Amino acid sequence: MKETTKARIELLLAFTLILYILPLKHSVTDFGYWLDWALAIHDHGISNVYRHGDDVNYHPIFLYMIWLYDVLMPTREHIIANINYLKIFPLIFDFLPVVVLCCFRQRLIQEKIPYLFLILNIAYLFNSVCWGQVDSIFSSLCFLALLTTLYKPSLGVVIYILAFYTKFHSIMFLPVMFLILAYKVRSWRGFLQVVIASVATVTIVLLPFIIQGRAADVFNATVKAVDFWPRVSVQAYNIWFLLVWGVPYDVFDSETFFILTYKQTGLIMFLISSGLTLIPLTRRLLSLRLNNAPPDRALKQLLMITLGLICFNFFYFNTQMHERYIHPALIMFFFYAVYSKNYIPYILISVAYLMSLEKTFPDFLPIERNRILFSARAIALLYTSTLVYTMVIFYRQHRLGYELKELRKLLFQWHAKP
């Protein structure tokens, strides 16, 4: 049996099984909002959802999914009764990366992928299947967008814009997207193709709102989402659970932390840590561009761990973080393991993520929680250990002194090139 055929059968069976046992429980608060938005779309149309829905602060792509759900439901009563089936949308995107990479002929990743190790990971599925949140949608789109841009920049940009209009957090990967575009786009024609694809995608996504003169509503919703939870941490067991005495949720991030505010301090730590993480990838992409070389295995392995660390830094240092904002790192660390054969970062982050989700929703899994192991600071220490371990691996392989020296040489070579 061909590997692609085997993958299709196994993934179809896994998807069908998960659908069959799809939990009826979900986040009452989140689904309360989504039911309100679904009824607002049903009554007033999708272009008016930001004006009639209660606290609508999600981007259009997820709202289009709610609209599609509305279309499939014949009456208001069915919309209300079957709202739990909205979980199917994020579940589809949980499967999307491995379906694309394992069920079809492609050149994005040529390695053998143990896809069941991702798909049957309860930490990976919990966010979609139990909670019913939508982080898997933008996570999978960002992953596929950045990989695709290595070969087809215009298509990659289209996918990335879809990710951005699903969740604003996609912006954390924007510097990597710019670096890949700088490596891949080498002519004015290629640049124009990317620009046209970008403008066309944004226009299509916003078209219903543009037609009704409601495009500003989307922008206002994005602004509204910023500082929606102005707390030091919202159940994200990150560095602030180790630095703040008491409960970080009870502390506003506008308060002073030594000299700066908590928010400013977290943002600076994120920018510095992510900036250092980007140096090896920048050097590698510039080297490949100067040598007119195609993407290779080493680049993709470096890309995966870089993306995972950027997401981890975003979650670990910034304020206002929820526990589920680490979700994209699971995909990145899994595919880093596919290349490196080192599954330790993926396993560690899966354990920490599952513990944090289970602590947030203690009634979902039949787990007897140990008060010490499942304490907030214990989970924060596990996240810290995972980040430190992964950074040690990263900087052992890519020593900053060497990377900076080589980057300076390449920049001089690029500047001197006629």
Positions of the model-derived regions?
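Transmembrane helical bundles and short interhelical boundary loops of multi-pass, membrane-embedded
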Residues: 22-23, 211-215, 219-232, 262, ...
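Transmembrane-helix motifs of polytopic, lipid-linked glycan transferases
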Residues: 84-111, 144, 272-287
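Membrane-interface alpha helices of multi-pass inner-membrane proteins
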Residues: 125-127, 144-148, 154-179, 204, ...
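Perimembrane helix-loop-helix junctions
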Residues: 1, 172-200, 210-214, 328
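Aromatic/glycine/proline-enriched transmembrane-helix motif characteristic
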Residues: 21, 98, 226-316
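Specific aromatic-rich, kink-prone transmembrane helix
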Residues: 100, 137-154, 332-333
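Extracytosolic helix-loop segments that constitute the early lumenal/periplasmic catalytic or substrate-binding loops
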Residues: 32-64, 68-77, 214-223
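Transmembrane signal-anchor helices characteristic of membrane glycosylation enzymes that use polyprenol
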Residues: 2-36, 44, 91, 120-121, ...
